Amino acid sequence: MAKIIGISGGSGSGKTTVVSKISEFIPEFVLISQDNYYKSVGDYEHEFSKVNFDHPDAFDNNLFYEHLKNLKKNSPIDMPLYDFINHKRQLKTVLVVPTPVVIVEGIMIFVEERVRNLIDLKIYIDTPNDIRFIRRLRRDISKRGRTVESVIDQYLNTTRWGYYRFIEPTKEYADLIIPEGGHNDKALYVLSTFLKSLSKEGLDFT
């Protein structure tokens, strides 16, 4: 069975940077982003401005769970791709062939117990709110076609609330908490040393 490493934390916490660091010590893995499992805005009965993307129900949780379960059993999946400009799932998918290690990252991957039970190593990135907001603002404007006003409005109305209601409480499930994300050199050194030892021992997380 494949080993799954889960990386969670608030939006803009530095999950991608930590994934990049892990890639230096685990040469072969597949990356699954929970973002690709957002539901299309067209699946909602109400207008886009009222859609809460910072709620667990914003994700296709059943498909996400089934795909992780299949990868853990070394079965390939057709991973969806989400279009953040048009806020809908693309028609095309990506064939993901499992490797001995699967890295999954997302803001709410530790919320559901059934998903947590599939993850062998749970890492939580704990980054200050102001830093996360600035990173999110820059990302959403440059990569997702958002305006400054829309990002601020979303943060004040749903993102901040969703973080404290759903995301931060999942720290209790983490095996490792990394303050400051990818900029915490000491924590990343500890993580890299741990992963090196696991690699030598055949990646047994038990």
From Swiss-Prot:
Residues engaged in binding ATP: 9-16
Gene3D superfamilies registered for this protein in UniProt: P-loop containing nucleotide triphosphate hydrolases (3.40.50.300)
The protein's annotated pathway: Pyrimidine metabolism; CTP biosynthesis via salvage pathway; CTP from cytidine: step 1/3; Pyrimidine metabolism; UMP biosynthesis via salvage pathway; UMP from uridine: step 1/1
Record-level GO cellular component terms: cytoplasm
SUPFAM superfamilies the record matches: P-loop containing nucleoside triphosphate hydrolases (SSF52540)
Enzyme class: transferase
Localization per record: Cytoplasm
Protein's UniProt keywords contain ATP-binding: yes
Entry's Gene Ontology BP terms: CTP salvage; UMP salvage
Positions in coiled-coil regions: none
Oligomeric and partner information: Monomer.
This protein's name: Uridine kinase
Organism of this sequence: Borreliella burgdorferi (strain ATCC 35210 / DSM 4680 / CIP 102532 / B31)
